[in-house]
Amino acid sequence: MGIISTILGVIGFGFGTTIGIVIGYYLFIYFQSTDVEDPEIKPLVELDSETIATMFPEIPMWVKNPDFDRIDWLNKLIGHMWPYMDKAICKMAKSIAKPIIAEQIPNYKIDSVEFEMLTLGSLPPSFQGMKVYATDDKEIIMELSVKWAGNPNIIVVAKAFGLKATVQVIDLQVYATPRITLKPLVPSFPCFANIFVSLMDKPQVDFGLKLLGADVMAIPGLYRFVQEIIKDQVANMYLWPKTLNVQIMDPSKAMKKPVGLLSVKVIKAIKLKKKDLLGGSDPYVKLTLSGDKVPGKKTVVKHSNLNPEWNEEFDLVVKEPESQELQLIVYDWEQVGKHDKIGMNVIQLKDLTPEEPKLMTLELLKSMEPKEPVSEKSRGQLVVEVEYKPFKDDDIPENIDDPNAVEKAPEGTPSTGGLLVVIVHEAEDLEGKYHTNPSVRLLFRGEERKTKRVKKNREPRWDEDFQFPLDEPPINDKLHVEVISSSSRLIHPKETLGYVVINLGDVVSNRRINDKYHLIDSKNGRIQIELQWRNSS
């Protein structure tokens, strides 16, 4: 009887429990407490200040800040690409972490550390808004608001002394506002040399951590402690103005930084060809480096002389010694009309031995075309001395990667002086009365320089630089900048689109100024000029 009673008691308990669960389930579904109400949905403008303050952290940046733009298109793009980005990012993370782990584990007597599982989950990050800053420098600055409530699964297995331990990271949430700067902008794909990343605020990080299957973050006080440690460590490394620098390409090669100086001494010419009707010539020599935007340099004119002697020295900045060549052209000066070319020749810089002067006597040719027939009559000879002086490592600025860095003046500049560099970048909103084919004319201490002409353009870009070696700083000098439009028409062939006069005293004290100047005598025209003062020491 005792056994039968026990069996009946167990059956009754099981039956009663089952009936109770079923009845409770239906009561929970079909009956609702009277104090439970549906949430009330209101427009944001109707909410009181206290409610808005509570919701404020969740409001997107483009709502709180008018200068932030919505970038839903980017979120859609990343949403479609996320399954592939997840695999690519995890693969790259493993390849980066593997050698670092292999280098560190011997110090802790650990046999191995491996990823048993590494996935970022199915939920992509969300960009709440983006702000782009406009600057006059060659850079792009962006600020992003990033939120990521992901479902990653990262399992790391460590083995030591025959034991195995697993660490699992789950339910990762990150909120950060990074500033991304792309600079300097260069004319080679992807069109920027470096990526600089800074955090504008301390990031908010939340995650779950399991050790041997147990939730470590459930330990009282540990959760808050770990959060603060992570915030402080990340802030110490990347909180603005500190940056993470990722180099995409060598900026010195992309921007073709100067690597040396070519010293040329034009000594004399011998038995030049007669160009004038009276049996003479008025020769001068023009020197240029191939692939250089800087205008060529010229000797003085020697009137009525077929065997002129100049003994003039010139310094040319070299950027690509393996491919550049020095072009020497002898012209016959004419008071009216185009100057006649007497002859020319070139010197390949790769054929020169650095730091070794070389005296050369060049035969003047009609042109450097290989199919050009040899002239029956000699055009004369040109005697020059050339020396290539590569810059030493000490002469290269430490911050050469910085596009705003100012170099020193070339060797040979007077100790009390330096080099004034004027870079004409661009102009905007130019208005010509008859035509708009702008070029820029610079006038400094009686010396005139000009940029190339841009046809039919109200927003021209030149990016041409001009150098003025000076014996003393231009503290009290002024630079006259004039924008001119020229045309081949007989009527109104030239007109001024505006001008500006720049005091150079600030350039000497600041070493670099890059600004946009409003043009005088122009309604809305502006021109961007960059000025650099490079001391000789």
UniProtKB/Swiss-Prot annotation:
Disulfide bonds: none annotated. Its cofactor is Ca(2+). Residues 227-505 are annotated as: Phospholipid binding. Residues 24-537 are lumenal. One of its GO terms (biological process) is lipid transport. Residues 240-362, 402-517 form the C2 domain. Belongs to the synaptotagmin family. This is Synaptotagmin-2. It comes from Arabidopsis thaliana.
